[in-house]
Amino acid sequence: MYPFLLLLVAYVIGSVPSGLIVGRVFFNTDLRDYGSKNIGATNAYRVLGAPAGLCVLIADVGKGVLGVYLGQTTGNIYDPALTVYCMIMGGLLALIGHSASVFLHFKGGKGVATGLGIILYLAPVETAIVFFVWCVVVGLTRLVSLGSVAAALLVPLTMWYFKEPWPVFIFGTVAALIVIVRHKDNLIRLLQGKELKVERIEKK
């Protein structure tokens, strides 16, 4: 039973609202009241500035990495033959925690940065490709949501191309769907031409 408690820890760590903590502790600001009202790195940059945005990004990516690591530890302790499945479960629980945080009444962020941390651990080559595409799309359009959806769509495609194990490919597909579904409101605003670009705003 003990090893599987680490998977529960992965969910709890994923649930930690990094953006909310950075905003409230260091800036006396609740990100949910400004900009896109999201607690992710993009809105942290938009409202609080680059250093805050970078801190939130690193923390959220770290949650994904740590979730997979805890899953790997669980597998190594319980049954090494199941390690890859435990790694995926740990990452998925961290992603679910980020998107449905126990500390935020089961609400949360979009899951992009945490998902990036997960695939960084599971599939670093694919992560480099996906991150490059994200940078290009965001650099050209200044629309983080568009870059995030494009990157999410690319995850299962690159995993298929590089012949990742089926459990990893299936996870990549599920994670991509979670990220895209979490961006449904952004997609509607994109179609309406109302989506916020990644630029600083003045708090009122």
Cite the ranges covered by each PLM segment.
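Cytosolic, membrane-interface loops and tails of multi-pass inner-membrane proteins
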Residues: 20-51, 188-204
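N-terminal signal-anchor transmembrane alpha helix
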Residues: 1-26
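C-terminal ends of transmembrane helices
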Residues: 19-22, 97-107, 134-141, 184-188
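Interfacial segments of multi-pass membrane proteins
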Residues: 45-50, 71-75, 93, 97, ...
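Short, non-helical or kinked segments that cap or interrupt transmembrane helices
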Residues: 29-41, 103-116, 143-151
